[in-house]
């Protein structure tokens, strides 16, 4: 039932993401309750994430609807980072986030860029994912500092 609820919320995400998923207490209640229940069953949580993972995790989709589904995946996946195995975290979460991290300077992808950062940081923060952090941290840092944080502050060559 929890998986079905999250699948239904995914189908409506193109609407709820525009009005703000935090603007409805009922939406938040259903989401967090479903996540809380599924988090008790890590294998089911992983199955859910596999069923909603981006179609092509190596590139950003051209269609806005597909990018919206990617945003739902990243936001939902972040809630399950603590119960996923390191292998699933790297295969599903880090892989899905990487294209958006690399596209950080694109202002049209800012919300997904931030979701990708959040999910990657959540994966890196879990002690058992130390090898994942060691493997992907150089790429993450290079991309983080390649993006101009404030467009009004000029970058000077040294």
Label each region the model flagged.
Residues 103:
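Short basic (Lys/Arg) and small-residue
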Residues 1-31, 41-81, 93-100, 110-120, ...:
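HEAT-repeat alpha-solenoid elements in large eukaryotic scaffold proteins
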Residues 92, 96, 120, 135, ...:
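Cys/His-enriched low-complexity segments
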Residues 84-91, 131-133:
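Short, hydrophobic/charged alpha-helical patches characteristic of ARM/HEAT alpha-solenoid repeats
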Residues 125-158:
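Long alpha-helical HEAT/HEAT-like repeat alpha-solenoid scaffolds in very large eukaryotic proteins
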């Amino acid at each position: 039932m929890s998986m079905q609820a999250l699948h239904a919320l995914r189908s409506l995400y193109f609407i709820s993401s525009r009005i703000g998923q935090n603007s409805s207490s009922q939406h938040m209640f259903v989401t967090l309750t479903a996540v809380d229940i599924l988090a008790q069953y890590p294998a089911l949580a992983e199955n859910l994430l596999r069923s909603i993972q981006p179609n092509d995790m190596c590139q950003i989709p051209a269609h806005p609807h597909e990018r919206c589904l990617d945003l739902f995946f990243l936001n939902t996946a972040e809630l399950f980072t603590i119960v996923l195995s390191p292998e699933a975290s790297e295969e599903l979460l880090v892989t899905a986030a990487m294209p958006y991290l690399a596209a950080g300077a694109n202002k049209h992808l800012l919300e997904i860029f931030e979701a990708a950062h959040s999910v990657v940081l959540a994966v890196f923060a879990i002690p058992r994912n130390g090898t994942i952090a060691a493997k992907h941290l150089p790429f993450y840092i290079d991309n983080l500092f390649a993006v101009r944080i404030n467009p009004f502050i000029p970058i000077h060559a040294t």
